[in-house]
């Protein structure tokens, strides 16, 4: 089933070329069906790339989704045209009196700062509080997951000696949780971060359940009570070449960055990346949408 997005959103062309089913709002309004209202709080500077990554995954389900893109009013985005934000994005003030079936909070390149040093932290806290009573389920990704774990449960993040960068094998730790329905016992997911949350801290919070982790990359998937909050420390939404672009960007900046682990064939950056996370990335998002959003949300929000 399709996702409903603005007909002029640049990501629309990318998705259509990949045979992702998209629909205009005008067409959707003629169908006698309630689409799920999904908000994406896009904290990434690469807004259009992140839009395509997430829409690609949530569009690959049998559900009709009405997608609302959000940006932070208290932060000036320097890497995206203001015209793009004005045309396709809303702020929290625009939607704070509405309810949503699902909310996705993305990562952000601010993890070396303390949470309180982030210029939009107060606004983000208001959004996370809002989500507790106005959203059926919220999926937090990477720094967004760290922020959610810290705000809701007091879980700290810790700096890493070296950037966790690459594609890592993870093990399922809970066998009978719907979020992991259809998962293999071992699966891969990309990580790209300078900080971590620790398994001992997660296990120390009785409301949280550790679902999957990696011997090398640490905590990946965590879930809160009744699936109202889901936390993914990795980047299952990443495109094939996202880590490659990050690696080349940092090299061009003169940063001392290692080749992303387990990513390029033969670990050679001159060869093609090996994509080993796509199927489980699709499964993660479809399970979240089906079991924790669609199956749980009321017909009338």
UniProtKB/Swiss-Prot annotation:
The active site is at 142 (acyl-thioester intermediate), 235 (proton acceptor), 237. It is found in: Cytoplasm. Substrate binds at residues 163, 192, 249. Its EC number is 2.3.1.31. It catalyses: L-homoserine + acetyl-CoA = O-acetyl-L-homoserine + CoA. GO terms for cellular component: cytoplasm. Its main location: cytoplasm. Transmembrane segments: none annotated. Gene3D superfamilies: 3.40.50.880. GO terms for molecular function: homoserine O-acetyltransferase activity; homoserine O-succinyltransferase activity. The keyword Acyltransferase applies. The record marks 111 as: Important for acyl-CoA specificity. Pathway: Amino-acid biosynthesis; L-methionine biosynthesis via de novo pathway; O-acetyl-L-homoserine from L-homoserine: step 1/1. Keywords: Acyltransferase, Amino-acid biosynthesis, Cytoplasm, Methionine biosynthesis, Transferase. One of its GO terms (biological process) is L-methionine biosynthetic process from homoserine via O-succinyl-L-homoserine and cystathionine. The record marks 192 as: Important for substrate specificity. Belongs to the MetA family. This is Homoserine O-acetyltransferase. The lineage of its organism: Bacteria, Bacillati, Bacillota, Bacilli, Bacillales. The gene is metAA.
């Amino acid at each position: 089933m399709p996702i409903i997005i603005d007909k002029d959103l640049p990501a629309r062309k990318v998705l259509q070329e990949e045979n992702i089913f998209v629909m205009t709002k005008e067409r959707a309004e003629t169908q006698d069906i309630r689409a799920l209202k999904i908000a994406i709080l896009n904290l990434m500077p690469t807004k259009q790339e992140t839009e395509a990554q997430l829409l690609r995954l949530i569009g690959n389900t049998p559900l009709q989704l009405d997608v609302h893109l959000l940006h932070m009013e208290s932060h000036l985005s320097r890497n995206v045209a203001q015209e793009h934000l004005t045309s396709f994005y809303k702020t929290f003030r625009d939607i704070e009196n509405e309810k949503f079936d699902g909310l996705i909070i993305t990562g952000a390149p601010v993890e070396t700062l303390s949470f309180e040093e982030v210029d939009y932290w107060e606004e983000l806290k208001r959004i996370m509080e809002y989500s507790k009573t106005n959203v059926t389920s919220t999926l937090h990704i990477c720094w967004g997951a760290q922020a959610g774990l810290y705000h809701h449960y007091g879980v700290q993040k810790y700096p890493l000696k070296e950037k966790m960068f690459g594609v890592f094998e993870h093990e399922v730790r809970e066998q009978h949780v719907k979020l992991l329905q259809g998962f293999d016992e071992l699966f891969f997911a990309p990580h790209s971060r300078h900080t971590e949350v620790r398994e001992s801290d997660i296990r120390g919070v009785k409301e949280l359940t550790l679902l999957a982790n990696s011997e090398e990359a640490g905590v990946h998937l965590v879930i809160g009570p009744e699936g109202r909050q889901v936390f993914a420390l990795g980047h299952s939404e990443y495109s094939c070449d996202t880590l490659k672009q990050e690696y080349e960007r940092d090299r061009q900046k003169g940063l001392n960055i290692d080749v992303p682990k387990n990513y390029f064939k033969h670990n050679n950056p001159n060869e093609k990346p090996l994509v080993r996370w796509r199927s489980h990335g699709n499964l993660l998002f479809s399970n979240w949408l089906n079991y924790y959003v669609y199956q749980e949300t009321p017909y009338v929000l």
